[in-house]
Amino acid sequence: KEGYLFGSRG
C-alpha cells in the first residue's frame, strides 16, 4: 500500500 511512496514497503 505504502509502495506508492516507498516502493519497498509495498
From Swiss-Prot:
One Gene Ontology molecular-function label: toxin activity
Tissue expression pattern: Expressed by the venom gland.
Main localisation: secreted
Record-listed Phosphoserine modification sites: S8
Alphabetically ordered keywords of this record: Phosphoprotein, Secreted, Toxin
GO cellular component terms, A-Z: extracellular region
Domain of life: Eukaryota
Places the protein is found: Secreted
Protein name (database record): Toxin To46
Native organism taxonomy: Eukaryota, Metazoa, Ecdysozoa, Arthropoda, Chelicerata
